[in-house]
Structures are given as C-alpha cells and as structure tokens.
From Swiss-Prot:
Protein name as catalogued: Tetratricopeptide repeat protein 29
Pfam family, one: TPR_12
Keyword Repeat among UniProt keywords: yes
One Gene Ontology cellular component: sperm flagellum
PROSITE patterns with a match to the protein in the record: TPR, TPR_REGION
Keywords tagged on the record: Cell projection, Cilium, Cytoplasm, Cytoskeleton, Flagellum, Repeat, TPR repeat
Function, in words: Axonemal protein which is implicated in axonemal and/or peri-axonemal structure assembly and regulates flagellum assembly and beating and therefore sperm motility.
Chief place where the protein resides: cytoplasm
Lineage: superkingdom: Eukaryota
Lineage start: Eukaryota, Metazoa, Chordata, Craniata, Vertebrata
Gene: Ttc29
Location in the cell: Cytoplasm, Cytoskeleton, Flagellum axoneme
Length: 471
C-alpha cells in the first residue's frame, strides 16, 4: 500500500503558541519566553476575538425592563426609575382588576414592548435632568411628548398620567404668560370629559377659556387656543344640559345653554353659534316656552341661511315644525316640514326624509285628510325599503297600514249604509281581492284603483309581500 506524505498545514500564530505549550512538546521553554508568549496571546485575543463587557453580559441575562431600570439607576435618574416602576405596578393592578371581573385582558405588559420602554427612558430622564436645572418648560415638553406618544385607546391611562404631570409642572412655568398652563387645563378638561365627569371638565375648560381670552396663542395646527376653548366649553355645556333635560331640570338646562350661546358668540364662529342656538331652542321647547323657542330657532335658521348650510337649515325647519305642532299651528308646521322634505331629498338624507314624511303623515291623519296622510306614509315606507332598515320598514309599514285603513273607512261606511245590491257586491269583491277601492257617491258604484300605490316595485316580491295590505 502506498503511503502519502503528511499534509503541510498553515497554522495561526495563536495555534502555534498553543501547540508549543502542549505536554507532548519536547522543548523546554524559558520563563521569559513564556511571559512574552502570554502577552502575544492576550494581544491576539484582544485584536481578533472581541469579548463581552459586563454590561453586555447583563443585557443578555436580564429582561429589557430590568436593563432599562438598571440604566436609569446607574445614570442617577432615581425619580425616573420610581415613576416607571409605579406605572408598571399600576398596569399589574389593572390586569388583576380585569381578571377579577372575568374580563379577557388583551393589553400587553409594558415590559414586553421595548419601543415604549425606550420612550420612557428617553423622555423621563430628559425631564428629570431639566427639572434639576429648573428648566420647567423643557420638563413640560418632555412629559407632553410622552402623553402624545401614549394617546391611543390601549394606553389612554398612561396618557392621562402624563396629562396630570404636565398640569402640575405647568403651574411652575412663568416665562410664557400662561400658555402652557392653558394647554394643561385643556388636557385635564379632555381627560375628565372622556371619563364622563362633566362638572370637573367644565371647571378646567372654564379656566382654559379664561387664560386664553385676549390672547393670539395657536396650537401646533395653527388653530387659535381661544377658539378651541370656546368649542370645548360649548360642547361640555351641551352635554351637561342633556343630563339636566333628562332629569326635567329645564331651568338649569336653559341657563347653562344661554352661557354656551354667549361663549359661542365670543368665539366668532357662526357655525358654533348656530349650533348653540339650536340646542337652546330645543330646551325651550321641552320646557313649554314655545314663543321663545321659535325666536331662538329662527335665529338658527338665519345663521344657517347666511352660511348656505342646507342641512342645518333643514334641522331648523324640523325643530320649528315641532314647536308649531305643539302650539296647534298645523298649517304652519306643514309648510316647514314640506321644506324639510325637499332639503332632505336634495341632500340624499334618507333618514331625514323618513322622519319628515312620518311627521307630515301624522299631522294629516289627525286632520282627517287620509289621502294625504296615506301618501306621506307611503313615501316614508318606500324610503325605508330603499335603505333596507328592518326596524324603520316595520314602523313605517304600520303607519302606512293605519292610514290606508282610515282612507278606506269612509268608503266602506258608505257601502254599508247604502244597503243595496251594488254596494254588497262591491264589499264582497273587496273581501276577495283586498285591492284599493274608491266609492263614487253620485254613480253609486265602485271603481277599483287601476294600480295600487304599494305595488310600485314589481320586481321586489319580498317588499310587496311585506306591505301593510298583504299582512
């Protein structure tokens, strides 16, 4: 068998040095040379094989949350660490409370979201460093940046925490004339408004409004803060008035809506002023002050006309018709409702068409004008079928059926009172076909309607089957 010569291998200097240290090596190496070789090995390792520092080892061993906390403490940001740790504890409490109520907890813990932890570290430490130097405006900006970052449905409780922190810091800022304090009041008002605590929200919005009066401050989008304050206060007053009206506290509701109207006028926003007038008019209507309600709603219609806002004008006509209907002025109410129907049709507002036609049908039904009542109820029913809303279809179908019954009532009574053979034949014929019939008192004969109003959709078999006369 042939024997191959040994392969020549190229070894690195480190490998050569290591092999020389092996027990099988026959050479005796002096101590000085060993020290030199060790230095060569250390240098080689340093240059070619990078080791891990203590910090890098800790980063691999610890969770990201722990690493962030350790960094805060090591860098001397003890307040930031305490605040972050407190937020994590609060999250645990919220989770336990949800589990106690047998709710499925979907929100991930903060420690599992490194991006959020990075933002905590960045802004909290910057805020703490600025606070040590007394730069409270910078503290506010960093805390507000955190509030904006957590402004979502999942982390709203974190946002609210930083809104409260901003509110406290804003009291210490004296160099901007109170702008940051005004912004903080607005944020606290929003916080309480979302939680349903409207009285507290109104207090903060009132402070916001007072601080911005006569100022030309703008927010990041370029909108005047005073206008935002007026809008927020008007909105909160309206929500408060809704609660008062539900409790039949009409005087307080009207009082607070008058304040809302005054603030809306101050904001120089005609649309907001008209909206405030609309709700004030409805409050006067609910309290039975019809003349005052008409006066206020007329103001709303004037504003809507000047703004060329047809939808608002339609709402004004509808509300004024309700007031006139309550006063018994049916003729005037009909005029406004007919205008409302035209506006609703022109703007493709099907629900408004249904509402207006139903109101007109009710009025004509009460007046005994059953043909017109039936016509408007039929329009409401047809529109409800177009929007395919089952609830509205059922409701308008009932109204239409009642109006049709009233429409036929006089005719049927005439047949019964006539007591002749022709009338009897007409009654029997109607019972067999159930089609619409009209009675001619002069000729004493029945004429079948050539086409029933309800059968306007020959292809819609299901709608025909659901019509009142087929029930």
């Amino acid at each position: 068998m042939a024997t191959f010569p040994p392969l020549s291998m190229t070894r690195t200097k480190l490998a050569v040095l290591a092999r020389q240290k092996l027990p099988c090596s026959s050479k005796s190496i002096p101590r000085a040379q060993l020290i030199k070789e060790k230095d060569d090995i250390d240098y080689y390792l340093e240059q070619n094989i990078k080791g891990l520092s203590k910090e890098e080892v800790a980063a691999h061993r610890n969770s990201y949350k722990k690493s962030i906390c350790v960094d805060m403490l090591r860098d001397g940001f003890h307040k930031s660490f305490t605040e972050l740790f407190s937020l994590m504890e609060q999250w645990d409490k919220l989770r336990e409370a949800a589990q106690a109520r047998s709710l499925f907890w979907l929100q991930r813990p903060l420690e599992d979201q490194p991006d959020k932890l990075d933002n905590f570290y960045h802004y909290l430490t910057k805020a703490e460093a600025a606070e040590r130097k007394g730069y409270y405006e910078e503290v506010y900006n960093n805390l507000y940046a955190l509030a904006c970052y957590f402004d979502n449905s999942e982390d709203k409780w974190v946002r609210n925490h930083f809104y409260e922190r901003c509110f406290k810091i804003a009291q210490l800022i004296k160099v901007d004339g109170g702008k940051k304090e005004a912004e903080a009041e607005a944020h606290m008002g929003l916080l309480y408004e979302e939680e349903g605590e409207l009285l507290k929200a109104a207090e903060h919005y009132e402070a916001f409004h007072e601080l911005t009066q006569g100022r030309l401050w703008k927010d990041a989008t370029g909108q005047f803060l005073n206008l935002i304050a007026c809008e927020s206060l008007v909105r909160t007053y309206r929500l408060l008035s809704d609660r008062m009206l539900q409790n039949r506290d009409y005087k307080q509701a009207i009082k607070i809506l008058i304040k809302a109207s005054e603030i809306a006028r101050e904001g120089n926003d005609r649309s907001m002023e008209g909206e405030a007038s609309y709700y004030l008019g409805l409050a006067h209507l609910a309290s039975g002050e019809y003349e005052t309600a008409l006066s206020v709603l007329d103001r709303y219609s004037e504003i809507s006309t000047s703004l060329d806002d047809e939808l608002s004008l339609g709402r004004a006509y509808e509300a004024m018709a309700k007031v006139l209907q309550s006063q018994g002025e049916m003729t005037e109410a009909i005029k406004y409702l007919e205008k409302f129907v035209v506006i609703a049709r022109n703007n493709f507002k099907s629900l408004d068409v249904i509402q207006a036609c139903t109101m007109l049908g009710d009025i004509y039904n009460e007046k005994g004008q059953y043909n017109k009542a039936s016509d408007y109820f039929q329009q409401a029913f047809s529109t409800a079928m177009e929007v395919t809303k089952t609830t509205l279809m059922d409701e308008t179908k009932v109204h239409y059926g009642i109006a049709r019954a009233h429409q036929m009532m006089l005719t049927m009574n005439g047949y019964i009172e006539s007591a002749d053979m022709n009338s009897l034949n007409c009654l029997l014929s109607w019972k067999e076909t159930r089609t619409q019939v009209e009675y001619d008192p002069i000729l004493g004969e029945a004429r079948k309607a050539t086409e029933d109003n309800i059968y306007q959709f020959p292809d819609a078999q299901e709608e025909t089957r659901r019509s009142p006369e087929n029930q």
